[in-house]
Amino acid sequence: MEKLQDQYSFLCSENIRKTNPLILNILQKLDEEIEKRPKEKITVNIAGNSRLDSGQRITSEDFWLLSKALRNHPCIGGVDVRYNLIGDVGAYYAAKLLQKQPNITYLNLMFNDIGPEGGELIAKALQKNKTLKYLRMTGNKIENTGGMLFAAMLQMNSSLEKLDLGDCDLGLQSVIAFSTVLTQNKAIKGINLNRPILYGEQEESTVHIGHMSKQNHVLVELHMCKHGMKNYGIQQLCNALHSNSTLRYLDVSCNKITRDGMVFLADVLKSNSTLEVLDLSFNRIENAGAKYLSETLTSHNRSLKALSVVSNKIEGEGLVALSQSMNTNLVLSNIYIWGNKFDEDTCVAYSNLIESGRLKPENTDVEPYVVDEHIYLSEVSNGLKRHYYWTPTYGECYVPSSSAGFALVPVGERL
């Protein structure tokens, strides 16, 4: 098999184009990896936000030649070109790559200036694709038009397991379309529909996703950040969770849920035995909401493993109640509380949990320290999805403590 760097150099000279030193360097390293492990699948990683490469970004022309070099190589299992400038033209070549390269199971195109036209090309390519397991389109403004085409694609595609369309400017129509399609699709295990462009206060998107969750018995991971969800919306989701036995990771962060919504959530946690990760970050559940959760976690629930209540206007009383529930509930291993109002009792309670070994330092986002014989808590870089937007390209790339949600509930080929 011809080396990737040689193939790329030949294509550049054949098409009278200059070789990109960044691509050439990465392909050289990949060739070395392939020589060491010829039977393993390799991911081509050319992230445009890598601090090691001085912010160089590849263009659609670069991606055209790169994709041609990758087409016939059996060792290529994934392509990650996040934070580059491939645009709609590059999306055309990505679609061609999906048609020509049968070994790719992971494709990351997040934040690449791909619009509705590029989204259409990729969605149509996936209608016939039978190998891709995980696609990230995060941050590409495919809008409602592109969203509708991806929803239509899911009616035909039976191999894609995880789809991330967060920050894609989806409209209400496409969110409803996904909800409808997912009542029938038996392959999708994880979906991200974060930050759609919604108008009105009727929470229609949440109502439809709630109906879908009642009928879908495959979905494991659901992200619904920034849906403008209020207590009525969380009530609809909770009604669905009473009869859902597959969902393990629910992300409803950055919404408008208050203490009243926690009544419904605490109630469903009494009977639901599958939900393992719950992200309530950046809502407003306050002390009362935290107490509802702590009571359920103390007396009933023994399935939840990770809870994030970051920035929820919770004060000492509610935070201490949650810490006390961990003394009784030995299944709950991860808790994230930064951004709330810590008093001395809170600092002492979480310090005791950490020092006793009940709460491992890597499983929380706070760390105790002492000044003048008083205990305080500082923030540490742990969380459910700290590396959702940015993953380090130096040192240890995958740190479970920074992406604990995905570590506890792994879905898709690459995370």
Swiss-Prot record:
GO terms, biological process: cell differentiation
LRR repeats mapped onto the chain: 246-272, 274-296
Keyword Coiled coil: no
Keywords in alphabetical order: Cytoplasm, Differentiation, Leucine-rich repeat, Nucleus, Repeat
Cell location: Nucleus; Nucleus, Nucleolus; Cytoplasm
Domain of life (superkingdom): Eukaryota
SUPFAM superfamilies associated with the record: RNI-like (SSF52047)
Cellular component aspect of the GO annotation: cytoplasm; nucleolus
Keyword Repeat: yes
InterPro entries tied to this protein: Leu-rich_rpt, LRR-containing_regulator, LRR_dom_sf
Primary site of residence: nucleus
Subunit structure: Interacts with NPM1 and NCL.
Role, per record: Highly expressed in stem cells where it may be involved in regulation of pluripotency. In embryonic stem cells (ESCs), important for normal expression of the pluripotency regulators POU5F1/OCT4 and KLF4. Also important for expression of the ectodermal marker gene NES and the endodermal marker gene GATA4. Promotes stem cell proliferation in vitro.
Protein name: Leucine-rich repeat-containing protein 34
Organism (species): Rattus norvegicus (Rat)
Species lineage: Eukaryota, Metazoa, Chordata, Craniata, Vertebrata
